[in-house]
């Protein structure tokens, strides 16, 4: 993991908004989606990881995508540079085995 690793989290109303955000984010920055959470009735949170600047770029693209999605609404968002290891260990923001190939590709580790 890069010393400049960051986590970004965005919460929206409606699944189409989070789907649009996810697609825009992976296209805009070299980030990895580490998961999403259904946070309540029609509320969804998407969590991403990557280099600080890449996360900032991806978050801006995700917010823009949500704002362009009919019926979707950004409720809140945050970017945390270099999250503390205790935060990573407890909250669902770490890389899982399922997303490892995407992390490797985003970080340029997969040279196939």
From Swiss-Prot:
InterPro entries per record: Bact_microcomp_CS (IPR020808), BMC_dom (IPR000249), BMC_shell (IPR050575), CcmK (IPR046380), CcmK-like_sf (IPR037233), CcmK/CsoS1_BMC (IPR044872)
Localization of this protein: Carboxysome
Keyword terms, alphabetized: Bacterial microcompartment, Carbon dioxide fixation, Carboxysome, Photosynthesis
Positions of transmembrane segments: none
SUPFAM superfamilies associated with the record: CcmK-like (SSF143414)
Keyword presence, DNA-binding: no
PROSITE patterns, per the entry: BMC_1, BMC_2
Role, per record: A probably minor shell protein component of the carboxysome, a polyhedral inclusion where RuBisCO (ribulose bisphosphate carboxylase, rbcL-rbcS) is sequestered. The central pore probably regulates metabolite flux, as might the gaps between assembled homohexamers. Homohexamers make sheets that probably form the facets of the polyhedral carboxysome. This subunit probably makes both homohexamers and heterohexamers with CcmK3.
Subunit architecture: Homohexamer. Interacts with full-length CcmM. Forms mixed heterohexamers with CcmK3, probably with 1:5 CcmK3:CcmK4 stoichiometry. Only very weak interactions with CcmK1 and CcmK2 were seen.
UniProt name for this protein: Carboxysome shell protein CcmK4
Lineage: Bacteria, Bacillati, Cyanobacteriota, Cyanophyceae, Synechococcales
Gene responsible for this protein: ccmK4
